[in-house]
Amino acid sequence: MKISRRKVVVLGASAVSASLLPINLLAQSDGQSAEDIIKEFTGGANIGSGDIMLTTPEIAENGNTVPISVESKKATAIKILALGNPGPDVVTFKFGPLSATRSASTRIRLRKTQDVFAIAKLEDGSFIQDIQKVKVTIGGCGG
């Protein structure tokens, strides 16, 4: 089978054009609002305050890599939410009964200056939260 020079040029141009299209599959929301996500996680229970510590930088120069850490001594699960992102549900950390520590650290993307929420489900079934405001100078979610 012979391939003409014209076909090669057309295929090459098509490939280059396709690579320039914005593909934000990971930053797309599945349509759930933050309230729905919280209600699903808590089962509609009240959220109090208590022994949970969310650590974030006050100012993030680059929203693509914002370091966070969260700790709660009696947590079985901790959900992180970034309400200013297209998809506010960032991550859920789960801890088993043999977990030595109930803490986690990661880097997240933040689209703009916003509040970051950490909601912990405790061993007794209650929920507590901590909120930190992060000022973002360069957004990280394609917005």
Question: PLM ranges: what are they?
Answer:
Residues 86-109:
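An anionic, turn-rich surface loop/hairpin at beta-sheet edges
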Residues 111-115:
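Extracellular Ig-like/FN3 beta-sandwich strand-entry sites
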Residues 64-68:
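Structural beta-strand segments of beta-rich domains
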Residues 1-16:
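N-terminal secretory signal peptides and thylakoid transit peptides that target proteins
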Residues 27-59, 89-93:
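Transition segment at domain starts
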Residues 72-76:
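Short proline/glycine-enriched turn/loop motifs at strand-loop junctions of beta-rich domains
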Residues 133-139:
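Short beta-strand edge segments in extracellular beta-sheet folds
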